[in-house]
Amino acid sequence: MGMTLSAPAAPPGRADIWIVIAAFNEGTMIGEVVRSVKVRGYPVVVVDDGSHDSTAEVALHAGAHVVVHPINLGQGAALQTGIKYAVHNDAHVVVTFDADGQHAADEIERMTDALATHNVDFALGSRFIGQAVGIPKLRVLTLKAAALFTWITTGVRLTDAHNGFRAITRDAATRLEIYQNRMAHASEIVSQIAKHKMRVVEVPVTITYTDYSLRKGQKLSNSVRILIDLFLGRISR
């Protein structure tokens, strides 16, 4: 799983809903993101995926549990580590949440409520039935292509197959095994939803694109990499 730097006591209230954040060189934003979640009473685990900056230290100071990968394994592997950590610590619900400030912490409750309201295993955030503030046109095209590819290969039709904002029941989390270490893990999760016949609902969420998040993850090379990883992931299984 990696080296654990901290295990602070869970805050009062909502202690069975764990927030999992995969982070790589996010020292600039991770403290603010962790605090935005902690103030709402959720325990948080940050998986520092081999960062070269102060990500782990900043997250620890902000009050997160921190698990460190000695080397960078990719977002999929970091999420797998975080989900297992949360389940091990008696999470009844696991929420995956981005480290770069794109997600809104005040929408976590909407996501977790959707699990019970719709009696589903997964609540998946969608920026296309919600809002995508400042999204680049290239990113829209890439995400639409990824959603189409995912629908064709899994039979699960979603508007936003690559949204990192998810709420997952404990039972579903224990069955989830992420093998794709890079961005294709998102479609792999949908593939497992189909394989295990798990129930899913999409929930409108707001994704805010900032100069920081655009520099971090919205390059053309990353968009192309998503599609390459999807293709390679399918032919290798």
Model-identified regions with their sequence ranges:
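Conserved sequence signature across two-component system core domains
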Residues: 23, 47-49, 69
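Catalytic donor-sugar/metal-binding loop of nucleotide-sugar-dependent glycosyltransferases
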Residues: 157, 178-181, 190-208
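Residues at the starts of beta-strands that form the adenosine-phosphate
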Residues: 16, 43, 199
